[in-house]
C-alpha cells in the first residue's frame, strides 16, 4: 500500500527448476548389512518475472531475475535386512545427506513499463543490469526408515526425516513475507497382494497400496509454518503375459494454513 493508501497489485510468474545427475555405489559388508554412497550433480536454471502496478493506471515496475545453478552434494547410507522366520523379513536404513553448495550466477533487470489489457509489456526505461554470483547452501538431511513384510505378499513401513534448515533465499525467490525454518516429515505406508501367482483371479494379483504422510515444509509465510499432509491410495495393475504393471495413484491432502 502506497503513502496515499492506494492499493498496489502484483503479477508473478516463473519457469525452470533444478535437475540432478547421480552416480552411486553399494557394498554388502555382512550377510544382512550393506552400505552405500552416491554423488549428485545438481544443475538448472530458474527465471522469474514480477510486475507491480496500480489498477487502472497502465504503467508499472517490472523485475526479471535469472539464476543459473550448479553444484555437488553427497549421500551416504546403510541398510540392515534379516528374516525373522521363513516368510517374514524386517529391514531398516539410515541415510545422511551431507551439506552441499549451489553456485548461482544471477542476472537482475528492473524496468519501468506500460502494459495493455492482456498485460503485454512495453519497456519505457531500464536500470543498469545487475550481475553477481552467490552461493546457496544445500542443507544436510537425516532420514531413518524401518519396515516389515513378506516378499510378493505385503509390506508395512515408516520413515522419519529431519533437516535443520529448508533452504535459502536467492534473487529469484525473495519475498518480504517469506522465510525458512526447520524441515521434518513422517510417513507410514505399505502394500498388499492377495495372491501374486493367481491364474484364476485378476483382482488377486493387483497390488493395493496406501499411506499417510505429514510434512513440515520449513517454508514460513507471514510467520506461519506451511505444512503438508495427505492420504495416498494406489493400485498396481498387472499386464497379462508380462512382468510389468500399470500404476495408478490417488492423493487427498491439505497444504498450508487454510
Regions found by a protein language model. Give the residues of each.
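Outer-membrane beta-barrel porins/channels
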Residues: 1-258
Amino acid at each position: 500500500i502506497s503513502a496515499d493508501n492506494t492499493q498496489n497489485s502484483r503479477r508473478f510468474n516463473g519457469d525452470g527448476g533444478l535437475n540432478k545427475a547421480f552416480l552411486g555405489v553399494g557394498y554388502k559388508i555382512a550377510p544382512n548389512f550393506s552400505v552405500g554412497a552416491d554423488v549428485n550433480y545438481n544443475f538448472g536454471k530458474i527465471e522469474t518475472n514480477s510486475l507491480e502496478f496500480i489498477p487502472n493506471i497502465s504503467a508499472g515496475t517490472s523485475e526479471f531475475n535469472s539464476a543459473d545453478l550448479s553444484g555437488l552434494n553427497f549421500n551416504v547410507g546403510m541398510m540392515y535386512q534379516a528374516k525373522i522366520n521363513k516368510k517374514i523379513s524386517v529391514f531398516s536404513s539410515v541415510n545422511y545427506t551431507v551439506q552441499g553448495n549451489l553456485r548461482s550466477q544471477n542476472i537482475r533487470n528492473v524496468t519501468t513499463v506500460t502494459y495493455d489489457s492482456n498485460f503485454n509489456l512495453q519497456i519505457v526505461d531500464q536500470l543498469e543490469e545487475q550481475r553477481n554470483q552467490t552461493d546457496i547452501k544445500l542443507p544436510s538431511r537425516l532420514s531413518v526408515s524401518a519396515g516389515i513384510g513378506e516378499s510378493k505378499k505385503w509390506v508395512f513401513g515408516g520413515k522419519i526425516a529431519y533437516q535443520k534448515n529448508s533452504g535459502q533465499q536467492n534473487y529469484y525467490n525473495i519475498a518480504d513475507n517469506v522465510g525458512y525454518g526447520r524441515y521434518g516429515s513422517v510417513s507410514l505406508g505399505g502394500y498388499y497382494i492377495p495372491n501374486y501367482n493367481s491364474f484364476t483371479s485378476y483382482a488377486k494379483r493387483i497390488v493395493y497400496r496406501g499411506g499417510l504422510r505429514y510434512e513440515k515444509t520449513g517454508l514460513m509465510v507471514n510467520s506461519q509454518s506451511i505444512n503438508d499432509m495427505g492420504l495416498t491410495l494406489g493400485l498396481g495393475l498387472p499386464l497379462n503375459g508380462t512382468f510389468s504393471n500399470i500404476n495408478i495413484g490417488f492423493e487427498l491432502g491439505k497444504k498450508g494454513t487454510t
